[in-house]
Amino acid sequence: MKQYDYKTISRTMLGDLHTPVSTYLKVRDIFPQSALMESSDYHGSENNRSFIALCPLASVSIDHGTAIFRLPDDSREEHPITDAYRVENALNDFRARFRVEGEYSNYCGLYGYTSFNAVRYFENIPVKDSREATNDAPDMLYILYKYLIVFNDFKNEMLLLELSLIHISEPTRPY
């Protein structure tokens, strides 16, 4: 299993002239698979942040009983979801391949979604497994992004964050 090591490069800017939505509308066509996530907790404004994620580096998707890893070196791995290898095992195995260090590294996680149909992987509830020709979105999709724009409305700050690859390590094998 390869280990991907990244460091963060960051720049903080004044964010009072930009909103998350207006910024996202400007960049979404330039960066396919971009994402906008806004905080809906208006009670604790000190932790109220919005995120724009751009340029996927790697992803893990769960669909039709299979976990699919897409890695930064363009490799792809498939792992069947079973009673012995559950969704949480797949997510942990994927996440363990990445190490991020540097300032604001806590923002550099997996961003994505879990659909309602993913309940089949956690509860004994039958869900019809159908395939759509036009929109066959995975039950779960989580992406590690190269660029993040973090809006802190409480401080009127906008943080630009980049993940820079510093090392790919191969596993050591005993001889």
Specify the residue positions occupied by each region the protein language model found.
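Single conserved hydrophobic/aromatic residue that forms the stacking wall/gate
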Residues: 166-175
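Structural signature of FAD isoalloxazine-binding scaffolds in flavoprotein oxidoreductases
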Residues: 59-60, 131-154
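An N-terminal JmjN-like helical accessory module and its immediate linker preceding a catalytic domain
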Residues: 1-61
